[in-house]
Amino acid sequence: MVTRMATKVSLEGKRVVLVPYMAEHVPKYHQWMQDSALLEATGSEPLSLEQEYEMQLSWTQDPNKRTFIVLDKDFVKGDLAHGQPHVEAMTGDVNIYMNDVDDPKVAEVEIMIAEPRSRGKGLGKESVLIMMAYGVKNLEIHKFTAKIGESNTASLSLFRKLGFEESSYSGIFKEVTLEYPVTNLRREELLKLLDEVIRHTHSSNNPSDSLLSGEATA
């Protein structure tokens, strides 16, 4: 059986580039995950490097998940050809999960800006918006959710500024769930955002990855 990666496109915005999570990224990602503050903020458990490689492989092969590494364009060296990991510019990751058993068009969004040098520059906001636009255009997502620990005030502030509203709270997990229904107006705004996103790709057997505007083939 041939295994297909779920994501075969890189998305270039004004300040960030979203690239598929590659094996070359794993050592740096593993280094981030040694930070107890990041583990708490993301609700993650520490993994060994070997487990991190296994996780990377499972994420990239999961048809119900899209995972991108966030690159800070200020630190990218060389060309932005698709397939180049640009580890030197890694700053975080952004994901969407289609894990609602009752509605496959609902997606949970996660964002992490791990590098202190890249915080406070609006990279998290731009990454989330590009990911949401990607989800609406490619995957026909009609509602986004975000689950955020109550102590993660930065993420709560970001998602609320984007228009997410609280839908529930878990006292056991001390976690807030926020929702963002994709109304017609919001869909138009997200799709308009794609006009400014450059898509870097190579040939893919996944039709849903060929629907973005501004293509640059590499």
Curated annotation (Swiss-Prot):
Expressed throughout the plant. Residues 36-183 form the N-acetyltransferase domain. Pfam families: Acetyltransf_3. Its EC number is 2.3.1.48. The keyword Acyltransferase applies. InterPro entries: Acyl_CoA_acyltransferase, GNAT_dom, NAT9-like. One of its GO terms (molecular function) is N-acetyltransferase activity. Signal peptide: none annotated. Disulfide bonds: none annotated. Oligomer. Probable protein acetyltransferase with dual specificity triggering both N-alpha-acetylation (NTA) and epsilon-lysine acetylation (KA). This is GCN5-related N-acetyltransferase 9.
